[in-house]
Amino acid sequence: MAKRKLTQNQTRRIQSNNAKTLHRHKKKDIEWSDEMLGESQEGVVVTRYSIHADVENEQGEIYRCNLRRTLSSLVVGDKVVWRKGNEQLQGVSGVIEAIHPRENEISRPDYYDGLKPIAANIDRIIIVSAVLPTLSLNIIDRYLVVCEIAEIKPLIVLNKVDLLAQEQRQEIEDQLKIYQDIGYEILMISAKSGENMEKLTALLAQGTAIFVGQSGVGKSSLINHILPSVNAQVGDVSETSGLGQHTTTSSRLYHLPQGGNLIDSPGIREFGLWHLDAEQITKGYREFQYVLGTCKFRDCKHLSDPGCALREAVEQGKISPVRYDNYHRLIESLSETKSQRHFSLV
């Protein structure tokens, strides 16, 4: 009997499980007895690694810690209870014992592990886009869906505007007006020339923010401008793909001199939404909300359905046709992705 050939997905899963097994086999857990640890204290996770995390205490001191096995997940921004060891063991200074309930979190779908949290307790999501390699309103809309579902205030930042001629700049401003019309804040900046960087740092001082955006849009350059001492590695835009190379290896929370915190994470280069269904995506479009539920049919797909209130609002100029088209493009892409991955919401 011929041996059944494994599918590509099955092969990937086997390779992933094998790698995880080898990692567990090689890892030597550090065992902390109770008498080796000090009193419980509060802290914030400022960096997360594969099996460790850096925790900052209330005095601003940072300690590398192990995680109790009972902790299901831990991300940058988490507020935790931890205990410092009486001495370091293999470079580790303490143990994280509990995580306080999160005010919010942003997550991305992971092919093997399901929905994977990226960061927690965020006040603002900074959506960074750029004129190079291209301005994609579709990508901006994807990030805005995440913001709306997580109920986190967004700021749309267009970087590298120094590359624009005045005529091009006006064209870009006209494209972005559809977001201003529905209440989103826009900031056109240049990390190179410094244009509007003071406004950006003033907004960042208002809480904890996280940068999101494709590689090559200048996130690392912005961090270098805001925090020169950090010197985040800057990657060039690939001439062949138009996408920048990975420049950040671990999620990190930075304290800003003027106040506020900034989280930079490599886990948000590709912000997949294939874990969401059509209803959730629809709720991610804020200007749709006032007409939802008023269509003639309850199962309206908001396409050519008779009596569609959403399509009627577009025809009347109350809703941007660009946003409407991006919405359906996103719904269609989700169906294709789930089919390719054999993914189910059940």
UniProtKB/Swiss-Prot annotation:
Residues 103-271 form the CP-type G domain. Residues 1-26 are annotated as: Disordered. Binds 1 zinc ion per subunit. One of its GO terms (biological process) is ribosomal small subunit biogenesis. Residues 7-20 have a biased composition (Polar residues). The keyword GTP-binding applies. This is Small ribosomal subunit biogenesis GTPase RsgA. It comes from Haemophilus influenzae (strain PittGG). The gene is rsgA.
